C-alpha cells in the first residue's frame, strides 16, 4: 500500500489514496496542560494551550479509520464531502497500526491509545470488534512495548443499525473482560435537545430517549466509566438536569470539547471558537458539576486545528490535488 505522510504540530497524518484510508498519530501535551477534570484533581482552568514538544513515550494516540469515508452525514464533519466506499478490513485495520508504529523511533510507551474514530462509524463494522481482540498482540509484534494498550470506540449511535445494541454490549464485554476495564466507549451526544441533535446528525442518530434506554442495559463499567461526549459551540444546548434524568452518573462521565474548525462546521454556521478562552467551556461545565457529574474539559491547541487533523481533510486535499493534476475541475 502506498501511503503519504503529512506532518503536523503533534504528529503525522497518513493518507492512502488507493485504498481510501486516512489515519493519524499524535502525542499529547500532558493532561495537566490541556485537561480540566476536578474529579481527577486537575482543577486549573485552561486558557489556551501552548504548542510544545510531545513525548510519545508517555502517551501515544493512534486514531484509525473503520470505514472508507462515512455513511453518516453529520453537519459538523467534512467526511461526507469525500463519500462512502465501504468498511475497512481487519488486514487494513492492522496495516494502519503497523504503519503508525514503524514510522516512529519510539519503541516503548506508558500508554498506547487506539481510537476507532477517524473516518467512519465503527458500529457499522464488526471487524473492529474482532480486531480489538488481536490488537495487543499486534502492538507487541510491531516491536512496541506498551505498558497499557487502550482502545476506544466512539459512536454516533446510528438509528438505522439494527445490530447497534448487540454491538455495543459486545464492546462493553470486551472492555470490561478482555481489557480488564482498560478500554473506552464514547457516545456522541452533542446536545440535550432532540431537534438540535437531528440537525447536527442529519436525523441519523437515535433519539435521546432511545440512547437513554440503551444506556440502562449497559453493564457497570470496569475501570473507566463510559463517556457522554459534547463537542460544543456557543449554540449548544446542554441541560445538566435533563442529562441527569437520562443517564446514570455511576456509569457515565461527561466530556466537553470544542467543535473543530472544519469547513462543514463553518459552512453550516457553527461558532467554532474558544481555544484560548475558558468562558465558553465554563458555562457548560459548572451546571454539570453542580448536578454531581464527573466532567472532563479537553482544550486543544489552535495549531491542532490549523493542521486540519480532523477526519478526512488530508484525504480530500490529496484527491483534489490528484484531480487537478489530471486536468479535472
Where does each model-flagged region fall?
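Auxiliary Fe-S-binding modules of radical SAM enzymes
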Residues: 1-40, 207, 213-329
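Active-site micro-motifs of SAM-dependent methyltransferase domains
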Residues: 31, 72, 121
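Short acidic/His/Gly/Ser-rich catalytic and metal-binding motifs that mark active-site loops
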Residues: 72-74, 194, 263-265
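Disulfide-bonded cysteines in secreted/extracellular proteins and peptides
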Residues: 70, 74-77, 311
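Core AdoMet radical
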Residues: 56-63, 69, 78-218, 225-234, ...
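N-terminal [4Fe-4S]-dependent radical SAM core
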Residues: 1-66, 88, 93-108, 327
